[in-house]
């Protein structure tokens, strides 16, 4: 990775394309979680990569390149959100299950259940604040460490821990309310 970054610092666009290919999915995912729509997320990701290219000389290598890039994506998205005054994000949880041992009808049933669970999680996350959604996205979906979340968001470690704990509690409460409403509507 260091060699690729050194080449990018020398102006090698092919090396930068390697960095883009390696990080575009995660950058887009984070942007999508923050922006709520595909078009804005694509623009944020593109803007972030342009900023990264223009400022690659500032990357000192103290943290992982991905952490540095996600910080740029995060800040670019927040700037755009402030301009557009968007308030919530849509989070898409993808949980993998091993369905190989099930019959076709069982597989379809499990897919339906998974889709339904995912829908409830998305809806519950939509009820949370942007900060709660960001910390959950970074920790659970992007699998960033607590330290990496600190670097991306400029929050203190204790603050990240508290926010993550509270975000989980709020998510659970939102899910309970949604499911309670769903059960009551069936009765």
Walk through the language-model features, giving the residues of each:
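Sigma70-family region 2
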Residues: 9-10, 36, 49-64, 83-85
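Arg/Lys-rich amphipathic alpha helix in sigma70-family domain 2
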Residues: 57-60, 71-91
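Helix-turn-helix DNA-binding module
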Residues: 123-134, 138-159, 173
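Short, charged helix-capping/linker segments at alpha-helix termini
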Residues: 9-18, 28-47, 157, 177-182, ...
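Structural recognition of an alpha-helix C-terminal capping motif at a helix-to-coil junction
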Residues: 29, 43-50, 63-75
């Amino acid at each position: 990775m260091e060699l690729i970054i050194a080449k990018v610092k020398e102006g090698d666009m092919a090396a930068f394309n390697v960095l883009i290919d390696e990080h575009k999915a995660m950058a887009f995912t984070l942007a999508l979680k923050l922006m709520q729509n595909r078009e804005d997320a694509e623009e944020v990701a593109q803007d972030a990569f342009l900023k990264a290219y223009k400022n690659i000389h500032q990357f000192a290598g103290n943290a992982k390149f991905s952490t540095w890039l996600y910080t740029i994506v995060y800040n670019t998205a927040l700037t755009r959100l402030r301009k557009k005054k968007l308030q919530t994000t849509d989070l898409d949880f993808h949980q993998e299950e091993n369905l190989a041992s099930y019959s076709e009808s069982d597989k379809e049933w499990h897919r339906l259940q998974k889709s339904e669970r995912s829908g409830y999680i998305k809806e519950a996350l939509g009820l949370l604040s942007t900060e709660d959604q960001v910390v959950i996205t970074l920790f659970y979906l992007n699998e960033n460490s607590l330290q990496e979340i600190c670097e991306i968001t400029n929050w203190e470690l204790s603050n990240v821990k508290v926010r993550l704990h509270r975000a989980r509690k709020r998510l659970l409460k939102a899910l309970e309310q949604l499911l309670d409403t769903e059960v009551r509507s069936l009765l």
